[in-house]
Amino acid sequence: MKLRGEVEQFEREFAAYLGLPYALAVSSGTGALHTALSALGIGPGQEVIVPAYMWVAVVASVVNLGAIPILADIDDTFGINPEDLLSRITPRTRGIIAVHMSGAPMNIKPIAQIARERGLFLVEDCAQANGASITGQKVGTFGDVAIFSFQMNKNMTSGEGGCVVTRDLRLYRRAVAVHDLGYSRDDQGRLMFDDPDLCVWGRGYRLDELRGAILRVQLRKMPIIVQNMRNSKYRIRKALEQLPGLKLRRIVDPTGDTGAFLITTYDTPTIAKEINHALRAEGITTYPQGLSNIRMTEWGLHLYYNIVSLIRRRSIDRLGFPWNLVENATSEKHYDKGMCPVADSLFERSIIMSIPSCLKSTDEDDIIQAFTKVLRHYCGNDS
């Protein structure tokens, strides 16, 4: 394809970083999800399995295409539980969206194996785990297609932006058509009209050159950003391992964790709430520009039962699309709290804390001291 400037250079550099042949920059992570699912041909009469812990855009991208999202419970990695996933597969299941949440890779290998064995597509949502890996293999390379987000809160950002990556040329060309004018392009950048499968309705998700230039610089910075966060997190985490009363999130591969978030889980929701308030009193507090230390029940549209449009099955149009479509008549459409009991319990008993890339050792000491004081008071000897 003819060189388009900063955006295409970023696409080539990001693809090389992941070890994949194709990357397509788009205007947002949500746009990346919509583009990926559109390229896969998702539509009415199909079901897509999604985790109970994700971002609202995951289910929105499925619903907007006329398919039905099916919830799967999570495990102690805070990713999809492979055993529960198997129980959610029906004859209508078309694919799985596996989400690497809160900075660390989920247990993706058994999910990928299930997808292969059942003939399902696998989309990796890497929006919160850019730079993560499992035994050296980067997230985003285990499935058929993956998406990334470069929104303002991400470890690599252009304010807004996203990317679709794949090793499948046909899928890439369909994604190009979706994100652009509805047609793919040849190697010279000219629109292709002769292949009916590549003639779709375009969405206009193109990324602009300014953000492409920013992302090229950010990509070069990302390894040190991830290293700083990981070093801070695991210094804190090592200290917390010695404290009573908490359980740390299971990390599939600590060397591949981006270090962006630290999740701690307690015996009961009441204890979690009290510890959260006590940590805030010690100065580990939320701040206007972002997340510092909150109970996971405050984590908004990342929790399935907080997505009101999903719970109420809100329609795209007045005719009830997609819920009332005859193609979707036999699909289960239940999303109330209680559908995913493991997730419900973890959300109620856990605290999530962000780990900035700019923490000093004195900041890490303050966090460790606050946890030590609070945990020994509530869960151990107050000495």
Report residues per predicted region.
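Phosphate-binding glycine-rich loop
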Residues: 2-47, 61-65, 71, 137
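Short, conserved charged micro-motifs
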Residues: 269-275, 360-365
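PLP-dependent aminotransferase-like
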Residues: 38-126, 133
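Proline-centric
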Residues: 73, 352-360
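Active-site region of PLP-dependent enzymes
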Residues: 129-135, 142-261
